[in-house]
Swiss-Prot record:
It comes from Pseudomonas putida (strain ATCC 47054 / DSM 6125 / CFBP 8728 / NCIMB 11950 / KT2440). Pathway: Nucleoside biosynthesis; alpha-ribazole biosynthesis; alpha-ribazole from 5,6-dimethylbenzimidazole: step 1/2. Its EC number is 2.4.2.21. NCBIfam families: cobT_DBIPRT, PRK00105.1. Catalyzes the synthesis of alpha-ribazole-5'-phosphate from nicotinate mononucleotide (NAMN) and 5,6-dimethylbenzimidazole (DMB). Keywords: Cobalamin biosynthesis, Glycosyltransferase, Transferase. It is an enzyme of class 2 (transferase). This is Nicotinate-nucleotide--dimethylbenzimidazole phosphoribosyltransferase.
């Protein structure tokens, strides 16, 4: 790789703001620690925003889409045409994330990195066309070096757009038939875990389908001879355009000082790639939920992440992260708007 912008320094957290927020928490009209994880979230957001009283009014959601050549191996319950059809649904307002974005008053950006329909042209979609999906990684590398660079940069560009628009929180979502297979393959390399422990039903495979999926991944990993110490090679060989873009977006956000709320299994794999490329970015990543894919719990543990929700979700699209936004907003509201003991004339210690 000739360009290594992802190694550039990430923004530091504001320790003074965190100290001020921590001190404020001790003065609010409640027993210390009684709001549990919400208190820690408010303090963390204070450090990320550099404000004693953080807010999350401006939320930017970007969906990255791309098709996967490995679908040729019969690893998905749905045909590849669904990826392009869902792009229409996103901008048409009918997808789950479209509804959630409206309810949250969040911006929604849709980026097509490369679907099988090279002629697809939809108003409201950024068509980058890095290829008609990735190559079948069971037989050859998924991406060329140029495609990988372009996908990472596409994510970085999305992060920069969000920062320029004043976003206080960035959510990346994904759409791509076959992408749980790519994510499981990447996680298998980076975590050193058997594919059988990380492969799940995705969009609805039965047990035999999940077993076949794991076998396809194991065969591909033997073909490519990948090492955990080289996450970029792993990303190029068995990843996806949208997974690379997510990793680029997370790194770009950390460098620009925009907090990231990571969605489910696929997004967590992208987060792991980002952290392996630049460990400084980890401080900027919050994790929304633990999903239904069996490998997600292992991933979260590797990232030392405490997810906010556990609802059995496996939709993707950034939907789980969007569902966690009200929780973060309420954490900020409680922190910023509750009275202190002095303001409320309430005794600050037991009798």
């Amino acid at each position: 790789m000739t360009q290594a912008w992802w190694r550039d320094a990430c923004q530091p957290l504001d320790n003074a703001a965190m100290d001020q927020a921590r001190a404020r928490q001790q003065q609010l009209t409640k027993p210390a620690g009684s709001l549990g994880q919400l208190e820690a979230l408010a303090i963390q957001l204070a450090g990320l925003q550099g404000l004693e009283r953080p807010t999350l009014d401006q939320v930017a959601i970007t969906i990255f889409a791309g098709d996967h050549g490995v679908v040729e191996e019969g690893i998905s319950a749905y045909p590849q045409a669904v990826t392009g059809q869902m792009l229409r649904n996103f901008v048409g307002g009918g997808a789950a994330i479209s509804v959630l974005a409206r309810q949250l008053q969040a911006s929604l950006d849709v980026v097509d990195l490369g679907t099988i329909d090279a002629q697809l042209e939809l108003p409201g979609v950024r068509h980058l066309r890095l290829g008609t999906g990735t190559a079948n990684f069971a037989r050859q590398p998924a991406m060329t070096e140029n495609q990988l660079q372009a996908a990472l940069q596409a994510g970085r560009d999305s992060a920069q757009r969000a920062a320029e628009q004043g976003a206080q929180l960035f959510i990346g979502g994904e759409m791509g038939i076959g992408n749980t297979t790519a994510a499981a393959a990447l996680a298998s390399v980076l975590l050193g875990c058997p594919a059988s422990e990380l492969s799940g039903p995705g969009t609805g495979l039965d047990n035999a389908g999940v077993q076949h999926k794991a076998e396809v991944i194991e065969r591909a990993l033997r073909l490519h001879g990948l090492r955990a110490e080289d996450p970029l090679q792993a990303l190029a060989c068995v990843g996806g355009f949208e997974i690379a873009a997510l990793a680029g977006a997370y790194l770009g956000c950390a460098q620009a000082g925009v907090t990231v709320l990571v969605d489910g299994f696929i997004c967590s794999v992208a987060a792991l790639v980002a952290v392996r490329l630049n460990p400084q970015c980890r401080a900027w990543l919050l994790f929304a939920h633990q999903g239904a894919e069996p490998g997600h719990k292992t991933l979260l543990a590797a990232l030392q992440a405490e997810p906010l929700l556990a609802l059995g979700l496996r939709l993707g699209e950034g939907s789980g992260a969007a569902l966690a936004v009200p929780l973060l907003r309420l954490a900020c509201a409680l922190h910023g708007q509750m009275a202190t003991f002095a303001e409320a004339a309430v005794a600050d210690r037991p009798a």
